[in-house]
């Protein structure tokens, strides 16, 4: 299984997963992540598939990207977390919350909304 690249700031059991927008990468959130880590979060800045230093694949939809996040959390032994998604990352985060509601403590979406 291919794994997602990430930068982790902080070392607590309060996990905040940050999912960037289209054509972005986790590192785009580093300034905010440093602040959140200082506030007691363990912040995971993830490069989603086909972005940053993560693997590239012709398979590219929100359900698959939600599965990528589940594999990442399993690999890191994270049972439940707060997920913050921006733009495309927000769609991934919402899909993850629908597919794996037991893994989401809180869901934050920015600059995106669900279709009605």
Task: Tell where the protein language model's regions lie, with residue ranges.
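Structural cue for short, hydrophobic secondary-structure segments
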Residues: 18-21, 45
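Alpha/beta-hydrolase active-site loop signature
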Residues: 23, 48-52, 114
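Alpha/beta-hydrolase fold catalytic core
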Residues: 1-17, 38-41, 78-79
